[in-house]
Amino acid sequence: MCPCPRHRGRGPPAVCGCGDARPGLRWAAAQVTALRLQALGDELHRRAMRRRARPRDPLPALLPALRARWPWLCAAAQVAALAAWLLGRRSA
């Protein structure tokens, strides 16, 4: 039985780098894993930079609707603030 988490309970496959008999294979597997993680990090970095390079229009579909309702939203916020202030005075 192989003690590593990947093979626990199932036994090792034909080629397993976890045993003490093949330390070179374990080292090679670690190098392959490190290279894969590095490639994954590079790809994620490339995608993030590509996303940042493209300018996006913030909320393009909601902007006209927000402009039309902005005075009502401001008035509603003031009414809510007044109500909160009055409720605070009553409870104190």
Swiss-Prot record:
Its main location: membrane. One of its GO terms (cellular component) is mitochondrion. Coiled coil: none annotated. Keywords: Apoptosis, Membrane, Mitochondrion, Transmembrane, Transmembrane helix. It holds the Pfam family Harakiri. GO terms for biological process: apoptotic process; cellular response to potassium ion starvation; positive regulation of apoptotic process; positive regulation of neuron apoptotic process; positive regulation of protein-containing complex assembly; positive regulation of release of cytochrome c from mitochondria. The keyword Transmembrane applies. The keyword Membrane applies. It is a single-pass membrane protein. InterPro entries: Apoptosis_activator_harakiri, Bcl2_BH3_motif_CS. The chain crosses the membrane at residues 70-88. It is found in: Membrane; Mitochondrion. A motif (BH3) lies at residues 33-47. The BH3 motif is required for the induction of cell death. Interacts with BCL2 and BCL2L1. Interacts with C1QBP. Promotes apoptosis. PANTHER family: ACTIVATOR OF APOPTOSIS HARAKIRI. This is Activator of apoptosis harakiri. It comes from Mus musculus (Mouse). The lineage of its organism: Eukaryota, Metazoa, Chordata, Craniata, Vertebrata.
